[in-house]
Amino acid sequence: MSRYDEIYARAHNEPELFWEEAAESIHWYKRWDKVLDRSNPPFYRWFPGGTVNTCYNALDCHIDEKGHGDRLALIYDSPVTNKLQRFTYAELRQEVSLFAGALSKLGVEKGDRVLIYMPMIPQTIVAMLASARLGAIHSVVFGGFAAPELATRIDDATPKVIVAGSCGIEPGRIIQYKPLLDTAIDLADHKPQKCVILQREEQRAELIPGRDVDWGEAVASANAHECVPIASTDPVYILYTSGTTGVPKGIVRDSA
């Protein structure tokens, strides 16, 4: 039997023991009361009673517990913009903790939703991890989605804050995100309290006073924020289906 087959068989035959051992490799603020709660099928709950933070396990533990702060955590290599950026764990945590502080200053708390409408750039990862750092629930929507599709997801997720890029860049063209976002908010019944806009040098956007906040300015006035422990059964993100066969369905992912 190969190592893969052995691991697969064990996960299949002894799932609770298998995942209990796997859970030992991540950081817990409080250990779970039991591995799997089967009391309300088909709504099973993993590691009830435990508290955890996804951002801590993605970043902080590599620095504080393993001493890997100077190791590479993220490489951004864009053939479209010809930009190459590298972030160590320590550098990425600095970016994330400051943006978490900016979101907190805008009122984002544990359990709030943050919708992210951005291209595939480092700041998208920063926004995701910053939301998780606060115990907020993020939802990434494909950058450049048409306004009606974006509006549907805004109404479903009801975000307190939307984080968006001013534009996306594809071979031979620039797609302005901000007009799409503005139209989507007009179409949606739910209105976010604030929109944080990352102004990209290729195409800056016009900000709406009182609602829109410049990413750079928000971070410049923010203080770094620590991780917020949340229940292992609390959501960490919502990922929507394509909606090609009907209304998009939000898939909720628990923290553990």
Please state what every model-predicted region is:
Residues 16, 97-101, 155, 246:
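Solvent-exposed alpha-helix faces
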Residues 55, 74-129, 146, 150, ...:
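Conserved AMP-binding/adenylate-forming core of the ANL superfamily
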Residues 70-72, 195-198, 208-240, 247, ...:
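Conserved pre-ATP/AMP-binding loop-to-beta segment of ANL
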Residues 133-217:
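Structural core segment of the AMP-binding/adenylate-forming
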